[in-house]
């Protein structure tokens, strides 16, 4: 059993290093989310300021747009500018996991893939939002994801530090967070 755990650890470390994501020992943490979350105030465009690197976001000028769908769920439209100048976008759907905690959402982009958590840890709706997600792998490892979002392409460093402190206080490592390039970006439709 110990040999199997060592092998899984080594493989997870290699995969994480290759993809820019980090596998951590243990289950996903459960940080507190935004109290009295109001999705209607959250709707609209958000620009990505910083993130824990992901395999599925490789471009720049990354932004997300949230709106209400006819079925009552939330439309999620993520867009980025690729290095070759083309726009990459993906559309998904989010819905609350539990009506008593509306800041805990699940988002799904492909019908054949499971939903992923999308937890709004903090937002003032007008300037910033902090989003956290975590994927547990066979209850031994976890991969943390975090995004600092803003209504504008730039956010004061004090606000970024405030949001990173929320992550750190919940045992979410921010050392690998990277700044998203939001310079000279086109307006996506």
From Swiss-Prot:
UniProt modified residues of type Pyrrolidone carboxylic acid: 21
Signal peptide location: 1-20
Gene Ontology terms: cellular component: cytosolic ribosome; dendrite; extracellular space; neuronal cell body; perinuclear region of cytoplasm
Annotated function: APOD occurs in the macromolecular complex with lecithin-cholesterol acyltransferase. It is probably involved in the transport and binding of bilin. Appears to be able to transport a variety of ligands in a number of different contexts.
Quaternary assembly: Homodimer.
Cited PANTHER family: APOLIPOPROTEIN D (PTHR10612:SF34)
Family: Belongs to the calycin superfamily. Lipocalin family.
Name the record gives this protein: Apolipoprotein D
Taxonomic lineage of the native organism: Eukaryota, Metazoa, Chordata, Craniata, Vertebrata
């Amino acid at each position: 059993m110990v040999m199997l755990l060592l092998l899984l650890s080594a493989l997870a470390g290699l995969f994480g290093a290759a993809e820019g994501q980090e596998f951590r020992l243990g289950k996903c943490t459960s940080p507190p989310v935004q109290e009295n979350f109001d999705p209607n105030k959250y709707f609209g465009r958000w620009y990505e300021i910083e993130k824990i690197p992901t395999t599925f976001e490789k471009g720049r000028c990354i932004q997300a747009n949230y709106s209400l769908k006819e079925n009552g769920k939330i439309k999620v439209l993520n867009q980025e500018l690729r290095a070759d100048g083309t726009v990459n976008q993906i559309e998904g759907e989010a819905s609350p996991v539990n009506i008593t905690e509306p800041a805990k959402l699940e988002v799904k982009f492909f019908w054949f893939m499971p939903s992923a958590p999308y937890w709004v840890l903090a937002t003032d709706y007008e300037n910033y939002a902090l989003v956290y997600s975590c994927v547990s792998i066979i209850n031994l490892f976890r991969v943390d994801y975090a995004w600092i979002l803003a209504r504008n392409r730039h956010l004061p460093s004090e606000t970024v530090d405030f949001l990173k402190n929320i992550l750190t206080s919940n045992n979410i490592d921010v050392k690998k967070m990277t700044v998203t390039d939001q310079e000279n970006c086109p307006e996506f439709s």
